[in-house]
């Protein structure tokens, strides 16, 4: 029996790994264990509960004002013991977090094969996003197998001399998770209390604009500028309702609350659990976000995305027209881009009908099928 360890620590990782964990656990020939680092404690636990995944190991590493170096050291030290005890033949990591890189390095040191899910995303700028671009490039150097979500991601890996035989194009597992999630909330098997609360708070006769912001490069004075644009849009359009789940980071919460509290058609809410968030995405007119996951999910729901960044490691969604880059460093760019999408029906229709370049919801099965087909795993 082949031993496999899944390691993740943040809410986005958990969402994207959940369908893969479920798929692997349904195969009796594979012994599956799950290790969470707790890099995003509360938001991570919500996702685990929703997908009914109980971790076998919980490193619970998070402390107040912890540096990236401290997080990395904690994961390396704690995971070293788990790998020595469980002795998996393969470790699965996802994306570009500090957990991703640290877990890959720990596995590399014990000669354990690293499987990198959502591999090959690149901006080619180590400072944007930081530290994610560095994390994913370093992880690619340590990985044995690369599950690239798109052909573009595969090409990026080939440019870095990754062997083609070690790459498979699978689509993105976030679409698998989204389809599971929509089915759960539609069938009322998920936690619907949050959805009921949202319905009571919002005026669904208005156009709902969902806003999410969390990246380091959008904090500080730039976040103040973005909030000014959002406020101006809200004050000029009484036919819209802006819903902003505010990230737990004190640096974000302080600015957002100062700038946007008290505006009647701006609803500042606590971070949403996964079922509430996908319900809100599904009911939004469009989305303003710096989130990578939102860029991947929203096209499946036919929701245009304005990406509040100057670049993206997901160029496919820009190229196919489902999303648009809106550089927040350009004065009034957020405001004018939102205003245009509200008024230009042809643009809205084109973006909402562009389709999803990130797959069909079968990525997890493709990864499992490839895994069991390898000679040394049977």
Swiss-Prot record:
UniProt keyword annotation of Transmembrane helix present: no
SUPFAM superfamilies, A to Z: UDP-Glycosyltransferase/glycogen phosphorylase
InterPro entries: UDP_GlcNAc_Epimerase_2_dom, WecB-like
Reaction equation(s) it catalyzes: UDP-N-acetyl-alpha-D-glucosamine = UDP-N-acetyl-alpha-D-mannosamine
MF (Gene Ontology): UDP-N-acetylglucosamine 2-epimerase activity
Residues annotated as catalytic: 214
Pathway stated in the Swiss-Prot or TrEMBL entry: Bacterial outer membrane biogenesis; LPS O-antigen biosynthesis
GO biological process: O antigen biosynthetic process
Keywords: Isomerase, Lipopolysaccharide biosynthesis, Plasmid
Family: Belongs to the UDP-N-acetylglucosamine 2-epimerase family.
Protein name in the entry: UDP-N-acetylglucosamine 2-epimerase
Upper lineage: Bacteria, Pseudomonadati, Pseudomonadota, Gammaproteobacteria, Enterobacterales
